[in-house]
Amino acid sequence: MIKNIGIIGGSGKIGTTFKKAFENIGLNVIVSDHKTKDQENDLINKSEWIILCVPIDKTLEVFDSIKNKIRKDQVFSDFTSVKSILGNNTYDFEFISCHPLFGPLNNIIGQNIVTIPISSGSFY
């Protein structure tokens, strides 16, 4: 069971929404963003599920900087609106692309999220 989640871009509106939701169900959440980029390696090392939640124009740049650090025993997800940016390749780690069908909310209970297995494994 996943207990430690890292959200890269977790200080933005969507990242904050999911940070609160995960913390409300007792999960540990580590956040990094452009102001705390030095914490990114620690986030990657300690997280079982890594979520990329950055603006579309930064998605590829940030993903390229972290993709070789993600281990096979970790799950990676992007919460980016445009799915063709990252989904055209094969990866050594489990990659589940996600698209929340809602904007920033105080409570995500009952909301829908589209999940797309890009590179599936035991978690999906």
Task: Indicate residue ranges for each PLM-predicted region.
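NAD(P)+-binding Rossmann beta1-loop-alpha1 motif at the extreme N-terminus of oxidoreductases
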Residues: M1-D42
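Phosphate-coordination loops involved in phosphoryl transfer and adenosine-cofactor binding
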Residues: I2-N4, D73, G110
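Hydrophobic Val/Ile/Leu positions in short beta-strands of Rossmann-like dinucleotide-binding domains
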Residues: I7-I8, L52, T115
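Short hydrophobic/aromatic-enriched beta-strand-loop microsegments
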Residues: V29, Q74-F79, E94-H99
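Rossmann-like NAD(P)-binding element
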Residues: D42-K67
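Short, conserved loop/helix-junction motifs that constitute active-site signature segments
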Residues: I66-K72, I108
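ADP-ribose/adenylate-binding Rossmann-like module
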Residues: I70-L86
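Rossmann-fold dinucleotide-binding core
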Residues: V82-Y124
